[in-house]
Regions:
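Conserved AAA+ ATPase small/helical "lid" subdomain
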Residues: 182-229
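AAA+ P-loop NTPase catalytic core and its hallmark functional loops
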Residues: 13-199
Length: 229
C-alpha cells in the first residue's frame, strides 16, 4: 500500500508545479521515476549553470541508461520530423538517425523553451504521444526536458499550455552545502571552497549587464584552469 501511495503522489504531480527542490532531492526523485519505470514526461526548470544537464547525465550513468541529449533550440522542425521519402504512389517520413530505435535510455530535450513555437509543436507530439509521424519512441525510453526561466534573463518562449500540462514540473535550486558536497567528491580546488565560504552569494549570481557571472558551472571551469596551473 505504501508503494502504491508513493506512485499515486508522483502521478498526481503531472501538470502541476512542484515546490523548489535541491539537487540531491531532485536526483532522488528522478531515480525513483527510473526505478518504477514511470514514463511520465519531466520538465526540469532552473537558472543557467546550476547543473540541470549534469543531474540527468548522472541518473543515466547510475542506471546504465543511454543518454541522447538534444539541444532543441538548435533544431529545425524537419530535424525532428525527418524527411519525406517518395515511393510509387505515396511518401513516407524517414526519421532522423539520432532518435532511439531500441534499448533503454533517456531522451533529453534540453533548452526546450528556447526553441521557437514551430519546433516546440513537433516536440509536443513527441512528448504527448511518444511519436512523430510514423516514428515511435521505444518503450524502454524516458522523455525528459529542461529549460531556463524568464526571470533568469533567458531568451525563452512561452510553453504552450497543452505541453506544459503534460509534464511533471521540477524546479531546481542550488546551495553552497550541495556544491561543497560535489566539490569534495570531484577534487575541486580548496581555494574555491574557501572563497565561497567567505562569499556564499557568489556561488550563483546572474548579472544581466555582464556576460560573465558566477555559477556552479563557471566555478567548475575555474577549477579546471587552476588545475592547469
Amino acid at each position: 500500500k505504501q508503494g502504491y501511495e508513493s506512485l499515486k503522489k508522483i502521478a498526481d504531480l503531472k501538470g502541476k508545479k512542484m515546490k523548489t527542490l535541491g539537487m540531491k532531492n531532485v536526483e532522488k526523485f528522478l531515480n525513483k521515476i527510473v526505478k518504477h519505470k514511470l514514463q511520465n514526461s519531466l520538465m526540469i526548470w532552473g537558472a543557467p549553470g546550476i547543473g540541470k544537464s549534469s543531474i540527468v547525465q548522472a541518473i543515466a550513468e547510475k542506471n546504465n541508461l543511454t543518454l541522447i541529449d538534444l539541444r532543441i533550440s538548435q533544431l529545425a522542425p524537419t530535424d525532428l520530423r525527418g524527411i519525406p521519402v517518395p515511393s510509387d504512389d505515396s511518401a513516407s517520413w524517414l526519421p532522423p538517425d539520432f532518435l532511439p530505435t531500441s534499448g533503454k535510455g533517456i531522451l533529453f530535450l534540453d533548452e526546450i523553451n528556447m526553441a521557437p513555437p514551430a519546433v516546440q509543436g513537433i516536440a509536443q507530439q513527441l512528448i504527448l504521444d511518444r511519436r512523430v509521424g510514423s516514428y515511435k519512441v521505444p518503450d524502454g525510453w524516458f522523455i525528459w526536458s529542461a529549460g531556463n526561466r524568464k526571470e533568469d534573463f533567458a531568451a525563452v518562449f512561452d510553453m504552450p499550455a497543452p505541453l506544459a500540462n503534460r509534464f511533471i514540473h521540477l524546479e531546481v535550486k542550488t546551495s553552497l552545502d550541495e556544491f561543497k558536497y560535489y566539490a569534495l567528491h570531484n577534487n575541486i580546488d580548496d581555494r574555491i571552497i574557501s572563497y565561497l565560504n567567505f562569499r556564499p552569494k557568489h556561488l550563483h549570481k546572474i548579472d544581466k549587464n555582464s556576460p560573465s557571472w558566477p555559477s556552479p558551472r563557471s566555478w567548475d571551469i575555474a577549477n579546471s584552469l587552476l588545475s592547469a596551473g
